[in-house]
Amino acid sequence: MTANPLPTIEEARSFLRSGRGGNVKVAVLDSGIETSHPLLRGLDLADDLAIVDLNFQIAAIPGEGRDVYGHGTAIAGIIRELAPEAEIGSFRVLGEHLRSRTLIIREGVRLALERGYHILNCSFGCGREDQVLFYKDWIDEAYTLGRHIVASCNNEDFMKREWPGHFPSVITVNFTDCTQAEVFFCRLGQLVEFAARGQDIEVAWTQGGRKKVTGSSFAAPHLSALLARILSRSPSLTPLQAKSLLHTLACPWP
């Protein structure tokens, strides 16, 4: 079997300009998505699930268009703005204080992979060394299935190890003060290789509101959306091929 050829850099730039995310499914593993928000008008979630612990048993229940914090709504708004034709699914794995458990996150990932999501946006990180292998299990599973993981990093020190961001197959994103939503940066030689807009940006928040935020959590969905644009025009890209292409398309990270 002959491998599908990689798009040329000129083709990839064209995909970034013209792609709208059609036929690409993006899973937002976060605090839920407020589907009634005015900035998300018309959004029909492909899935809306909350992963919860019911009497020591992890289960998925209806998310009911609810965000328990605001974080997930912000992520969804960024993705929808940049890739308006992408299908978005909400997998609520973070609680009211943006905390979670490894098993809850793992179940959210399992459901997203099972339901055919191409990109998993993970705007969270766990710095506990004793949890690394649990994260590695699903990162490896996603990689072997050809799915793309986009993650945030530690906001105070992007070199500080957090997972899933500190796995080489993951597209990990720091934030910059760049004001252009479609511009992103790359610096090789470290596991946090990418950076995108994420400082003092206005995003959708709970109760139909807006909020000015800063952090890598809000930079990551920029890359998720731009990757969705590319995949909508070149759907056979593997995670490593896509990451290599993003390296080439990115501006130098100063």
Per-segment meaning from a language model:
Residues I58-R128, R233, A250:
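Subtilisin-like peptidase catalytic core
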